[in-house]
């Protein structure tokens, strides 16, 4: 029942929200937002287990699939689409599905989140299998679309996890791993796009970033698999080579082009003073980890 969910309770501190000045509203929001990171901290051990599961999927050439409705679905898609430019993944490695399809990203599709079968159809469309990890996201922890997706994922042997913002969430019953970030009452009653949405974004950031580190997409704290899809990223790529190797900008730019704009290969070429082909071979042997290639 909705009334039993902490995310649906009224916030005692903001009972007179409509009478507050703009500054008071903003201060109240800021005060409440400060509690979110602490709530996430309480779930670090569970998030770690999820990351380990995702890394295992990636190592077996499986995928990470997010499913959610409304804000939760949009946040999953947002995290997924950032992975190719940031970590050089293909667009299949991390995917996001939202109840009602992509059109629901910009406009609500009424009733879609209440249909369990829609998630099963979405997951069947990509040939979900036992190598994949499915993460169901729902602030309330009770969204039928997410429950349906988790049920189907379990039926094909995929790994499953859930992210919710209430304790003892319904979706936790259908996932092998559960992250329950208790964010409590929102300043605007029931508006879970606020603290709950912020908490979900923080958790998704952790999962995707830590998982990519775990499969060699990062060297030191540099995103060495960045894709040079625009001028800003081309410039960033050269700067990453400078930071990783200590060479001048000119030398970095030269190796960047010699390595056919492969940042990892350019770094290995500079540090081992080798040719492009040898750098690629060393990276292949090291399964993409720059540190191991060196």
Swiss-Prot record:
Residues in the signal sequence: none
Record InterPro entries: Etherase_MurQ (IPR005488), Glucokinase_regulatory_CS (IPR005486), MURQ/GCKR (IPR040190), SIS_dom (IPR001347), SIS_dom_sf (IPR046348)
Residues that span the membrane, as ranges: none
Swiss-Prot/TrEMBL keywords: Carbohydrate metabolism, Lyase
Reaction(s) the record says it catalyses: N-acetyl-D-muramate 6-phosphate + H2O = N-acetyl-D-glucosamine 6-phosphate + (R)-lactate
GO MF, one example: carbohydrate derivative binding
Enzyme Commission code(s) on record: 4.2.1.126
Segments forming domain SIS: 54-217
Active site positions: 82 (proton donor), 113
Any one Gene Ontology BP term: N-acetylmuramic acid catabolic process
Metabolic or biological pathway: Amino-sugar metabolism; N-acetylmuramate degradation
Listed HAMAP family: MurQ
PANTHER family: GLUCOKINASE REGULATORY PROTEIN
Annotated family: Belongs to the GCKR-like family. MurNAc-6-P etherase subfamily.
Additional observations: A lyase-type mechanism (elimination/hydration) is suggested for the cleavage of the lactyl ether bond of MurNAc 6-phosphate, with the formation of an alpha,beta-unsaturated aldehyde intermediate with (E)-stereochemistry, followed by the syn addition of water to give product.
Quaternary structure annotation from Swiss-Prot or TrEMBL: Homodimer.
Classification via NCBIfam families: N-acetylmuramic acid 6-phosphate etherase, PRK05441.1, PRK12570.1
Described function: Specifically catalyzes the cleavage of the D-lactyl ether substituent of MurNAc 6-phosphate, producing GlcNAc 6-phosphate and D-lactate.
Protein name (Swiss-Prot/TrEMBL): N-acetylmuramic acid 6-phosphate etherase
Taxonomic source organism: Bacillus cereus (strain AH187)
């Amino acid at each position: 029942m909705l009334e039993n969910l902490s995310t649906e309770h009224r916030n005692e501190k903001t009972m007179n929200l409509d009478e507050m000045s703009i500054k008071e509203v903003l201060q109240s929001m800021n005060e409440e937002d400060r509690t979110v990171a602490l709530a996430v901290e309480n779930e670090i051990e569970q998030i770690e287990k999820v990351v380990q599961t995702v890394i295992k999927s990636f190592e077996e050439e499986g995928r990470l699939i997010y499913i959610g409705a409304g804000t939760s679905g949009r946040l999953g898609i947002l995290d997924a689409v950032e992975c190719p430019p940031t970590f050089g993944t293909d667009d299949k490695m991390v995917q996001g599905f939202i109840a009602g399809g992509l059109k629901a990203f910009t406009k609500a599709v009424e009733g879609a989140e209440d249909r369990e079968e829609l998630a099963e159809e979405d997951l069947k469309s990509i040939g979900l299998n036992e190598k994949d990890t499915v993460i169901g996201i729902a602030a309330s922890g009770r969204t039928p679309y997410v429950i349906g997706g988790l049920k189907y994922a379990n039926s094909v042997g995929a790994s499953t996890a859930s992210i919710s913002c209430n304790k003892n969430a319904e979706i936790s019953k259908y996932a092998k791993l559960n992250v329950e970030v208790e964010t409590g009452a929102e300043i605007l009653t029931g508006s879970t796009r606020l603290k709950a949405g912020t908490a979900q974004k923080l958790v998704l950031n952790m999962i995707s970033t830590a998982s990519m580190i775990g499969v060699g997409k990062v060297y030191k704290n540099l995103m060495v698999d960045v894709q040079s899809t625009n001028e800003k990223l081309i410039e960033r790529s050269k700067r990453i080579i400078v930071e990783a190797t200590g060479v001048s900008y000119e030398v970095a730019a030269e190796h960047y082009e010699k390595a056919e704009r492969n940042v990892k290969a350019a770094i290995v070429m500079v540090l081992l003073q080798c040719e492009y082909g040898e750098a690629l071979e060393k990276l292949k042997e090291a399964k993409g980890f720059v540190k191991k290639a060196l």
